[in-house]
């Protein structure tokens, strides 16, 4: 059934726009250039407002997810990477449940990736229609059918651009992937902005600067009681404070420390005697994939809940999914869940909130740990990184595990890889929860994604430099 399903959508995949694989080896300088161009296009799209919208000043239902999904409200990047990640989530779940089967051949992998791209485009159109029809840009009846269609087309074209930019980097023209690049850029931009923002906000305490560090100097300069000013800079409410900034730095350090945890399996050449090496299995075996997929799941739950609560407010089943409230304290107007599944799947706002509602905190912790472990373990089956796939790669390189026959390699690898994937996903979820409870800037999930992505780029940079030989020796 699985192969039949992929064969059915094969004709549609053939007409999709595609980036051709490079016919030659792309030099490191060219990769840096293409990566910079990709990032520039993304940042430009983040600043171009959607044409035809009447208003985007209403409470933002996806405020908490925008940093993670690299989206910017009221611009071409309204949807961000959400369609790509959602399509990946759907295809992974279908493959993990064996509803569709992905073979080991390059043809089957290419067909699977094509199906993922097709779903990405369909989801882009679907999300664009939902955003317009739920009144995020104004009442659809007031805007008219023509303007509504124009906004949907703009969002679809922008979504297609994101898909192609991601594919451009994935095919080897640039460094890393578009998804990782866009997420890391968005999160780092948020952290820097909340640390140094010169924007002033009117609070009950008077006019204050949004940026935590600028607020520190402003409070020390304007307040006569310096101790109280210092305390306010560290613990002020509803705006970024120095404790949030210190928590962010602390989480950065903890995640980088855990990145070094790994088990080295001894391997040897089956062809040349005396040639030994190691195969590393990292603690974060699936890297940040679990948290990206978990974010996609929650964001789509938010979309569905918001759409239903707008149309069917007061319905019991709709309220069971999520009830929402608006707030504008300490920043732009935003909607946040106050009941239902969406509430329990959202992080507590602070450590004080944990003490006020421990049941919420307990359910959130269980959800984060369970979903990250599940996504991590199922991802290895569809990404070519399971024990069977690793054994096949080692066999192709004529390498075997020391002390084991070639036929028993899969069994031995199965002792480590699924465990590393599940436990690594569990740790990723745990670190995200810890960062949320500490009040790190950009949410625990966002910080975790930023650190793992930056570390990935560091590893890519080291690898590229080492391949350049003498240049690598000079730099490292």
Swiss-Prot record:
Keywords on record: Endoplasmic reticulum, Membrane, Protein transport, Translocation, Transmembrane, Transmembrane helix, Transport
Chief site of localization: endoplasmic reticulum
Transmembrane segments: 34-53, 77-96, 118-138, 145-165, 173-193, 241-261, 289-309, 355-375, 421-441, 446-462
Gene Ontology terms: cellular component: endoplasmic reticulum membrane
Name of a matching Pfam family: Plug_translocon
Cytoplasmic side: 2-33, 97-117, 166-172, 262-288, 376-420, 463-476
PROSITE patterns for this protein: SECY_1, SECY_2
Segments in the Lumenal topological domain: 54-76, 139-144, 194-240, 310-354, 442-445
Tagged with keyword Nuclease: no
Top-level taxonomic group: Eukaryota
GO BP annotations, alphabetical order: protein transport
UniProt subcellular location: Endoplasmic reticulum membrane
InterPro entries (UniProt xref): SecY/SEC61-alpha (IPR002208), SecY_CS (IPR030659), SecY_dom_sf (IPR023201), Translocon_Sec61/SecY_plug_dom (IPR019561)
Membrane-topology annotation of the record: Multi-pass membrane protein
Family: Belongs to the SecY/SEC61-alpha family.
Role, per record: Component of SEC61 channel-forming translocon complex that mediates transport of signal peptide-containing precursor polypeptides across the endoplasmic reticulum (ER). Forms a ribosome receptor and a gated pore in the ER membrane, both functions required for cotranslational translocation of nascent polypeptides.
Summary of subunit composition and partner proteins: The SEC61 channel-forming translocon complex consists of channel-forming core components SEC61A1, SEC61B and SEC61G and different auxiliary components such as SEC62 and SEC63.
Record protein name field: Protein transport protein Sec61 subunit alpha isoform B
Species of provenance: Oncorhynchus mykiss
Lineage: Eukaryota, Metazoa, Chordata, Craniata, Vertebrata
């Amino acid at each position: 059934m699985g192969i039949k399903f992929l064969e059915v959508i094969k004709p549609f995949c053939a007409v999709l726009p595609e980036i051709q694989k490079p016919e030659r080896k792309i030099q490191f300088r060219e990769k840096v250039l293409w990566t910079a161009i990709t990032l520039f296009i993304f940042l430009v799209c983040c600043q171009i407002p959607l044409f035809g919208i009447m208003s985007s000043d209403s409470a933002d239902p996806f405020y908490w997810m925008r940093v993670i999904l690299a989206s910017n409200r009221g611009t071409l990047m309204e949807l961000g990477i959400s369609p790509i990640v959602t399509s990946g989530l759907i295809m992974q779940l279908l493959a993990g449940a064996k509803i569709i089967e992905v073979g080991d051949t390059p043809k089957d992998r290419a067909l699977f990736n094509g199906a993922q791209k097709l779903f990405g485009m369909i989801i882009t159109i679907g999300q664009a229609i939902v955003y317009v029809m739920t009144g995020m840009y104004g009442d659809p009846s007031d805007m008219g059918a023509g303007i509504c269609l124009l906004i949907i087309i703009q969002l679809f074209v922008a979504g297609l651009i994101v898909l192609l930019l991601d594919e451009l980097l994935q095919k080897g023209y640039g460094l890393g992937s578009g998804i990782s690049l866009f997420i890391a850029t968005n999160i780092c931009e948020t952290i820097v902005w909340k640390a140094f923002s010169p924007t002033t906000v009117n609070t009950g305490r008077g006019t204050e600067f949004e940026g935590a560090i600028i607020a520190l100097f402003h409070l020390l300069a304007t307040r006569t009681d310096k101790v109280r000013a210092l305390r306010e800079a560290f613990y002020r409410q509803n705006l970024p404070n120095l404790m949030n900034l210190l928590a962010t730095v602390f989480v950065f350090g903890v995640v980088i420390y855990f990145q070094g945890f790994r088990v080295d399996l001894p391997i040897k050449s089956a062809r040349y005697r005396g040639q030994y090496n190691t195969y590393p299995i990292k603690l974060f075996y699936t890297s940040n994939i679990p948290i990206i997929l978990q974010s996609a799941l929650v964001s789509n739950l938010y979309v569905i809940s918001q759409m239903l609560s707008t149309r069917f407010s007061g319905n019991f089943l709709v309220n069971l999914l999520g009830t929402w409230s608006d707030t504008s304290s300490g920043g732009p107007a935003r909607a946040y869940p106050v009941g239902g599944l969406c509430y329990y799947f959202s992080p507590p706002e602070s450590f004080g909130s944990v003490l006020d509602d421990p049941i919420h905190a307990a359910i959130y912790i269980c959800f984060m740990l369970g979903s990250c472990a599940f996504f991590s373990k199922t991802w290895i089956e569809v990404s070519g990184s399971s024990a069977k796939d690793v054994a096949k790669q080692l066999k192709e390189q004529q390498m075997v595990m020391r002390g084991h026959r070639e036929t028993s390699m899969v069994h031995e690898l199965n002792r480590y890889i699924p465990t590393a994937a599940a436990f690594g996903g569990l740790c990723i979820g745990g670190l995200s929860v810890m960062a949320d409870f500490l009040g790190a800037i950009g949410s625990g999930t966002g910080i975790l994604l930023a650190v793992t992505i930056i570390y990935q780029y560091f590893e890519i940079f080291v690898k590229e430099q080492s391949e350049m030989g003498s240049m690598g020796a000079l730099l490292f």
